[in-house]
Amino acid sequence: MRTIALLLAYDGTDFAGSQWQTDIRTVQGAIEAAWEALTQEQRRIVLAGRTDAGVHASGQVAHVQTATRHSLATIWRGLNAHLPTDVTVQNVGEAVRDFHARYSAIEREYRYLIDCAPVPLPQLRHQALHYAGTLDVTAMATALKLLEGTHDFAAFTTATPSQRSTVRTMYWTRIVERVWFDRRLLAIELAANAFLQHMVRMIVGTLLLVGRGRMTVDQFGEVLAGRDRRLAGPTAPAHGLTLTAVRYPPGLIRWVEPLERQQGATKVEQPSSYVHEE
């Protein structure tokens, strides 16, 4: 048996979340159907993280235990040929035998996108939350920094504290301002060892209260310390959220190089320099 790792990207708009559900369209279900069509194997695909309906991914990771002898390049091309257009396999890799997409992960990264233009852009309606009002980004960034380190994030989850630990370690946070098509976009980015259910969306919803002047930075800190969901702001809509990366200790996965995928897994040496002349 082999353990194959998959790097996935998907538009979550038309999926009822990532995790398999009976008779409902999910990311896991789409990948398992494509895998069976390619290999004639019925295998369970294991995802690194669960995403809700409407949430996107550009760096989701999955693994599958398989007996197939297909090359990695064939798996990459074959899965993409069988998958719908709103989910793709960006890369494939050979993983160590005991690799687990979820339990081997040491870091997850998310980005929440806010479109701050006066009028929404239709092309962004499924990828960014539109907010036309004024936001105090400095106050939002200051409040966001309070989350870094190891804390009990019970105030920012719908999970029942008695069911599981709500302590997580936030490695870093930042708010990046970008201009795209003459529009001002805010990207709220967070990295942690793991995230709780709805955690990022609840953090963003509370940060928006800070940005709008309806909550102070100190009050935001009190929400975190209070560990009470009722103190936090509303849950931000799902469509602005993207899982951007899942990270692992080195040596667990040998990802295929881009040229190997293009050349059918034949290694091609890249030139040391490249000059393009018109």
UniProtKB/Swiss-Prot annotation:
Keyword Transport: no
GO annotation, biological process: tRNA pseudouridine synthesis
Catalytic residues of the enzyme: D52
Top-rank taxon: Bacteria
Catalysed transformations (reactions): uridine(38/39/40) in tRNA = pseudouridine(38/39/40) in tRNA
Uppermost EC category: isomerase
Subunit architecture: Homodimer.
Protein family: Belongs to the tRNA pseudouridine synthase TruA family.
Designated name of the protein: tRNA pseudouridine synthase A
